[in-house]
């Protein structure tokens, strides 16, 4: 993309360098606004054209850049060519820049930036994304919330790029906790409470039975026996377990809907209780399964007894473990979906677990293990509601809504809203997501409610405010002015800065699609919003001549469109009034 300008520059370079234009596309980039000391719109990195060896000293590259620039000519697209630090710089014809960018944004709509030449030639893939994955009856902690919003972003971006994406929620719905839960429900459970608030009641039962099991060995033994009955397929035990699972999923779906998140498949460890036994047999048949003195079964991934490379795959009573069920799930998904890539989104504490799972798949003879990828993220500290620690996702959403409603009530400029609760939740979620996505996903960060809800500065509230403000401009002036426009009316520095920034959207999407880091898009949208705020003050529409007003309105409409596109990719629903 960059509206075809990048390709036009690549075509001219290809004639001089005798290289196909396709080989040059990724070496040509739009110049970020913050670096615009000069007037260039695009730059060619001379380093990226040369072989990366030590023979190319800095002066040589600078000389080559100068020689290359001298061989190039200005044309109807490029109005000026110059050299920078190891770069050749290109300035685009101003009227052409204005007309082409604005036309492209309006014509491409939600696809702006995604039809870029940066993405052409990339094969369409089938991608499985496993994310969120809470444990039934345990706390839906902040790690699950991070997994949910990060996984949703990755799935959104891959889908927008035309890939077939399968979103899987792999629930922790099996294991020893269900022995405790089954026993606990028989002791302390109430059917009415289970039906009215399943997640809350199961959690209360789970906490209570854990306390009892710690003090009373007979309760711990009963829990162990209940789980063994589950593993052996006891009808009564399975019926109770199924009820817990079904009611929990109904509740999850309702809460995920508030987040704007959905899944194509609600899977879980329980699906693989039988298939995990097949995995154990396969490991044994390949001579990879080793029995320990304690009666457990392990796989030695080092081959030389290194304790750090030992992975336990079976308990002494023959029941399966998390790793075994993950192996069975991966094999089943390949059979079912024949995926090109499978992405697991979990906290960085599971890094070793996934390394071992992928390694075991490989030594079992599954070459496609290389298509599996773990996207780890850091820990969030200090997220508490007013009632204390976060227990369930719904607590977070309710807290967001409450705090945002209070904020909106205290601001004089808040508009009369048809549904203030919905607006508050959408703005609050934007605030939460932007705070989370601003840094590297792998970084830990300290959560602050006060910082999240600041309306000024680099926050989600600021993005939503900018979108609502631009939408209000269109509502107020749109009918009279949104016809044809004169590009000569958008030559002020504020207009040009916005147009230059809009040029870069495809590069930002490309970067995020390569490293799965949403911060590139977040940074881009925040800069766009700051540029729009400056332009809104200086580029008046009211009382301007119709030709000027129309051109400016087109510019602001393009900004709002790209802002909305980027926000939706991040998992944010833009608001039109606030």
Swiss-Prot record:
Changing residue 283 to Q: No effect on mitochondrial membrane localization. Pfam families: DALR_1 (PF05746), tRNA-synt_1d (PF00750). One of its GO terms (molecular function) is ATP binding. Changing residue 342 to V: No effect on mitochondrial membrane localization. Changing residue 333 to G: No effect on mitochondrial membrane localization. Keywords: Acetylation, Aminoacyl-tRNA synthetase, ATP-binding, Disease variant, Ligase, Membrane, Mitochondrion, Neurodegeneration, Nucleotide-binding, Pontocerebellar hypoplasia, Protein biosynthesis, Transit peptide. SUPFAM superfamilies: Anticodon-binding domain of a subclass of class I aminoacyl-tRNA synthetases, Arginyl-tRNA synthetase (ArgRS), N-terminal 'additional' domain, Nucleotidylyl transferase. Changing residue 441 to F: Found in a patient with complex IV deficiency and non-lethal infantile mitochondrial disease; uncertain significance. It catalyses: tRNA(Arg) + L-arginine + ATP = L-arginyl-tRNA(Arg) + AMP + diphosphate. GO terms for biological process: arginyl-tRNA aminoacylation; mitochondrial translation; tRNA aminoacylation for protein translation. Changing residue 530 to Y: No effect on mitochondrial membrane localization. L-arginine binds at residues 133-135, 144, 322, 326, 350. Its main location: mitochondrion. Changing residue 469 to H: No effect on mitochondrial membrane localization. One of its GO terms (cellular component) is mitochondrion. It is found in: Mitochondrion membrane. It comes from the Eukaryota. The keyword Cell membrane does not apply. Changing residue 245 to Q: No effect on mitochondrial membrane localization. The modification N6-acetyllysine is found at residue 568. Residues 1-16 form a transit peptide. A motif ('HIGH' region) lies at residues 133-144. Belongs to the class-I aminoacyl-tRNA synthetase family. Catalyzes the attachment of arginine to tRNA(Arg) in a two-step reaction: arginine is first activated by ATP to form Arg-AMP and then transferred to the acceptor end of tRNA(Arg). This is Probable arginine--tRNA ligase, mitochondrial. It comes from Homo sapiens (Human). The gene is RARS2.
């Amino acid at each position: 993309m960059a509206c075809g300008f990048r390709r036009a520059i690549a075509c001219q370079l290809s004639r001089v360098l005798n290289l196909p234009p396709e080989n040059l596309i990724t070496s040509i980039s739009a110049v970020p606004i913050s670096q615009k000391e000069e007037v260039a719109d695009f730059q060619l990195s001379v380093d990226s054209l040369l072989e990366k060896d030590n023979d190319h000293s800095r002066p040589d590259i600078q000389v080559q850049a100068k020689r290359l620039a001298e061989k190039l000519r200005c044309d109807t697209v490029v109005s000026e060519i110059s050299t920078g630090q190891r770069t050749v710089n290109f300035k685009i014809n101003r009227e052409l820049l204005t007309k082409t960018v604005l036309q492209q944004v309006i014509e491409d709509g939600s696809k702006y930036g995604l039809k870029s030449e940066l993405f052409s030639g990339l094969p369409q893939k089938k991608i499985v994304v496993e994310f969120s994955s809470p444990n039934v009856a345990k706390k839906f902690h902040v790690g699950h919330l991070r997994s949910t919003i990060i996984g949703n972003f990755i799935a959104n971006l891959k889908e927008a790029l035309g890939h077939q994406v399968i979103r899987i929620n792999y629930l922790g719905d099996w294991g020893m906790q269900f022995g405790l839960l089954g026993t606990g429900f028989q002791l302390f459970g109430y059917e009415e409470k289970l039906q009215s608030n399943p997640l809350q009641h199961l959690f209360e039962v789970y906490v209570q039975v854990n306390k009892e099991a710690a003090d009373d060995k007979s309760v711990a033994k009963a829990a162990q026996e209940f789980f063994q009955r589950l593993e052996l397929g006891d009808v009564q035990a399975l019926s109770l377990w199924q009820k817990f699972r079904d009611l929990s999923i109904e509740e999850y779906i309702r809460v995920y809907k508030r987040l704007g998140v959905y899944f194509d498949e609600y899977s879980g460890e329980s699906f693989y209780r039988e298939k995990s036994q097949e995995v154990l047999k396969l490991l044994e048949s390949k001579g990879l399964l080793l029995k320990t003195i304690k009666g457990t079964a392990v796989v030695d991934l080092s081959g030389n007894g290194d304790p750090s490379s030992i992975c336990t795959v079976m308990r002494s009573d023959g029941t399966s473990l998390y790793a075994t069920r993950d192996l069975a799930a991966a094999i089943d998904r390949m059979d079912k979906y024949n995926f090109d890539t499978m992405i697991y989104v979990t906290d960085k504490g599971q890094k070793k677990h996934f390394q071992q799972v992928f390694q075991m798949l490989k030594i079992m003879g599954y070459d496609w293990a290389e298509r599996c990828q773990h996207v780890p993220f850091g820990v969030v500290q200090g997220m508490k509601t007013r009632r204390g620690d976060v227990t369930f996702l719904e607590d977070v959403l309710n807290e967001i809504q409450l705090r945002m409603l209070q904020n909106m009530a205290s601001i004089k400029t808040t508009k009369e809203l048809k549904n203030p609760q919905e607006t508050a939740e959408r703005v609050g979620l934007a605030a939460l997501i932007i705070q989370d996505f601003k840094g590297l996903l792998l970084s830990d960060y300290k959560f602050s409610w006060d910082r999240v809800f600041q309306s000024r500065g680099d926050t989600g509230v600021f993005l939503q405010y900018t979108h609502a403000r631009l939408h209000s401009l269109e509502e107020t002036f749109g009918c009279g002015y949104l016809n044809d426009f004169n590009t000569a009316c958008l030559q002020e520095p504020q207009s040009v800065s916005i147009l230059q920034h809009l040029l870069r959207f495809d590069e930002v999407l490309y970067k995020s699609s390569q490293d799965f880091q949403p911060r590139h898009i977040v940074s881009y949208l925040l800069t766009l919003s700051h540029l729009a705020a400056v332009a809104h003050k200086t580029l008046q529409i009211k009382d301007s001549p119709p030709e000027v007003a129309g051109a400016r309105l087109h510019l602001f409409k393009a900004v709002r469109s790209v802002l909305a596109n980027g926000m939706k990719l991040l998992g944010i629903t833009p608001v039109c009034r606030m």
